[in-house]
């Protein structure tokens, strides 16, 4: 079987996009197996994940994502911007604001057009942050895991746990460049206090409107950007009294603008998505 695919990236977080609205792909090969093959940067297309366009009975379109190790996360913010741009430009949806079914619930992206009606950016309503430990999930006796101390490799690390439909452990440090991300990130990702594992963000606060972060993604390792992670970081920073409700988050792949609307309690993330190339691959 040969598959048509589109390679997309959002701030360097890259994905292999597939249209399986007719179900032909999943009938041929399981998505986790396909993810392992296509995400290989030596033997496949290469990517931080595969994203599948599927039909939905509850939203305008359905979204599924699989990590390079075959695991299925609930959602991906950068992937959602790529997804939204692709389905809009391909005419799968025609509205600039539409609904997407994900494992994290219904997500609402909005396409922002230039004067020439080109896709300039995508603003994604990420929904409400989840702060109750049992829903993140994170093993904790408090109502919120804010500045919670845990033991990691014999050291005490202060984390704030947030879910944006997927779990995040946010750690504030003096200089993110000096962090041994692979060792610490992997240890926290698989920490026993996170029964579903977790994404890990190390953050340096520049001022009350700017943050710098590095991310270790659950099932993918270090990536250049993470949209749900940037959203979780703003929530964690705000809960710790470090930032305002709107901030610019600097990631290795570029910048995201994050706004936490206090009236609706929703997070809004705005950033770019780029078409890299299209192709066909035999599986």
Curated annotation (Swiss-Prot):
Main location: cytoplasm
EC supergroup of this enzyme: isomerase
Pfam families (UniProt xref): DAP_epimerase
Residue sites binding substrate per the record: 13, 67, 77-78, 166, 199, 217-218, 227-228
Catalytic machinery residues: 76 (proton donor), 226 (proton acceptor)
GO biological process terms held by the UniProt record: lysine biosynthetic process via diaminopimelate
Keywords, in A-Z order: Amino-acid biosynthesis, Cytoplasm, Isomerase, Lysine biosynthesis
InterPro entries referenced in this protein's UniProt entry, alphabetically: DAP_epimerase_AS (IPR018510), DAP_epimerase_DapF (IPR001653)
Site, Could be important to modulate the pK values of the two catalytic cysteine residues: residue positions: 168, 217
Family statement: Belongs to the diaminopimelate epimerase family.
Record protein name field: Diaminopimelate epimerase
Organism: Desulforapulum autotrophicum (strain ATCC 43914 / DSM 3382 / VKM B-1955 / HRM2) (Desulfobacterium autotrophicum)
Name of the gene this protein is made from: dapF
């Amino acid at each position: 079987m040969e598959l048509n695919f589109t390679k997309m990236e959002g701030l360097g977080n890259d994905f292999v996009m597939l249209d399986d609205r007719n179900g032909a792909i999943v009938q041929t090969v399981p998505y986790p197996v396909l993810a392992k093959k296509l995400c290989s940067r030596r033997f496949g297309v290469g990517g931080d994940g595969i994203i599948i366009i599927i039909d939905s009975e509850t939203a305008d379109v359905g979204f599924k994502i699989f990590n390079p190790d075959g695991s299925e996360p609930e959602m991906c913010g950068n992937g959602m911007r790529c997804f939204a741009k692709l389905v809009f430009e391909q005419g799968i949806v025609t509205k600039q604001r539409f609904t997407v079914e994900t494992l994290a619930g219904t997500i609402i992206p909005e396409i922002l057009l230039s004067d020439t009606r080109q896709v300039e950016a995508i603003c994604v309503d990420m929904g409400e942050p989840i702060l109750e430990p049992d829903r993140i999930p994170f093993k904790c006796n408090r109502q919120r895991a804010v500045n919670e101390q845990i033991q990691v490799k014999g050291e005490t690390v202060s984390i704030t746990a947030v879910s944006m439909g997927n779990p995040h452990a946010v750690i504030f440090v003096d200089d993110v460049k000096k962090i041994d991300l692979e060792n610490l990130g992997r240890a926290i990702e698989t920490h026993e206090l996170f029964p579903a594992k977790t994404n890990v963000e190390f953050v340096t606060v520049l001022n009350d409107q700017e943050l710098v972060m590095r991310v270790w993604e659950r099932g993918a390792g270090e990536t250049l950007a993470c949209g749900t992670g940037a959203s979780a970081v703003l929530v964690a920073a705000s809960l710790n009294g470090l930032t305002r409700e709107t901030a610019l988050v600097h990631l290795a792949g570029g910048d995201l603008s994050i706004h936490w609307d206090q009236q609706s309690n929703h997070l809004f993330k705005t950033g770019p998505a780029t078409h890299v190339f299209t192709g066909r691959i035999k599986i």
